[in-house]
Amino acid sequence: MMTKNLGWLATPLLTLIAPAAHAEWALNMPKGITDVSRSVYGLHMLTFWICVWIAVFVFGWMIYSIVVFRHSKGAVPDTKLVHNTKAEIIWTTIPVLILIGLAVPATKTLIETDDASNSQLTIRVTGYQWKWGYEYVGSGVSLLSTLDEKSNAARQLGSGIDPFTVEHYLLNVDHPLVVPAGTKVRLLITAQDVIHSWWLPVLAIKKDAIPGFVNEAWFKIDAGAIGTYRGQCAELCGRDHGFMPIVVEVKSKDDFDAWIKTQQAASAAAAAAAAAPAAAPAATPAAAPAKAS
């Protein structure tokens, strides 16, 4: 009977230990690849350690009081002590000082995250059910980013494909958002249908995409942070909410400029091909044959 019970306990433990097939996870937020993300991380850790020390003090004092002043040791309640001005001043002043100490860096970080002025590149981000649209404002380049074919095939019921064999399962797309490193990029985030949320942890950005409303965010990625970074929609937006990942590919400025030129050339060629049939002259109808007299 005990072996059977241990088996039931082992199942959830193994589930927790096993690597997730559909997502990467961590116990803490990442430091990120921007100055703002590191500021957010620092604020988060400052708050965390303050809470830890408060918990250690409060629970430590409670446990000490319970053990030392327990009834079995002959302790009796003190009915005379009902008020202590000095103690009340201390336990009021300390929380106020803690809140002020947190408010200063929090306000500084909040102001920094909202300052999208002097951006060098503007990208319009639009959420759809269930994909993301990216438009590079002023460059004539736009793209739709959807779940890649391998992940889409593996997620289908009865596909027979083991998700563990798919690289970056449910976290890969056909067309990633390409951005340059060392450049201040401004995002204008909105949605076409329902509320979505554009969330990329390494940038410390999580902004709702709301139909008829534009939210603003910005980032400037470290010059040495060339690579690919992944996020997800963080707002329940319908049936396929879990299947519209966010992938950002960071390139050097030179590589990004070359990529933009390639995309512009491809867009121009596609537009020319689409306009060609409309520009061709209509065929002259054949003359009707003359009637025999």
Predicted ranges, named:
Residues 1-24:
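N-terminal secretory/membrane targeting signals
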Residues 23-46, 66-293:
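Non-transmembrane, membrane-proximal soluble domains of secreted or membrane proteins
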Residues 44-69:
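Alpha-helical transmembrane segments
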